[in-house]
Amino acid sequence: MGRMHAPGKGLSQSALPFRRSVPTWLKLTSDDVKEQIFKLAKKGLTPSQIGVILRDSHGVAQVRFVTGNKILRILKSKGLAPDLPEDLYHLIKKAVAVRKHLERNRKDKDAKFRLILVESRIHRLARYYKTKRVLAPNWKYESSTASALVA
């Protein structure tokens, strides 16, 4: 996928395996994988962190092939999904970090410019999630309350 605020075209991407069946050497069942997902979500991990742990520690390459559903959909069915979508959360976290940096370094013009770019991405993503009804229609990003969102 191409970059929004950079010249790179971003042509490289990871390739999914052609076979969509569960490997024969995997001994975990669908229920075992779901229990692991619930346990990791209760620890406060994000869906992508859960996927990395399942891949690296338990040998589950794709949760969707084993369970039939994606991690976020499994979490939503149990009511464990995060309030904010993960990509929006990380953008807000980045904006808070840049703003904190700007408090210490007032003359950093490049950081000020990057903050504008990050916040414009936040507004664009928030508009998308409002149309998809993931966020409430009255949800609004404000820099003053952003640190409370990611704390």
Curated annotation (Swiss-Prot):
Major location (coarse): cytoplasm
Pfam families the UniProt entry points to: Ribosomal_S13_N, Ribosomal_S15
Superkingdom classification of source: Eukaryota
UniProtKB keywords: Cytoplasm, Ribonucleoprotein, Ribosomal protein
Gene Ontology process terms (BP): translation
Keyword Ribosomal protein: yes
Gene Ontology CC: cytosolic small ribosomal subunit; nucleolus
GO MF term set: small ribosomal subunit rRNA binding; structural constituent of ribosome
The keyword Cytoplasm is assigned to this record: yes
Gene3D superfamilies found in the cross-reference section: 4.10.860.130, S15/NS1, RNA-binding
Subcellular location: Cytoplasm
Oligomer status and interactors: Component of the small ribosomal subunit.
Protein family per UniProt: Belongs to the universal ribosomal protein uS15 family.
NCBIfam families: PRK08561.1
Role according to the record: Component of the small ribosomal subunit. The ribosome is a large ribonucleoprotein complex responsible for the synthesis of proteins in the cell.
The protein, known as: Small ribosomal subunit protein uS15
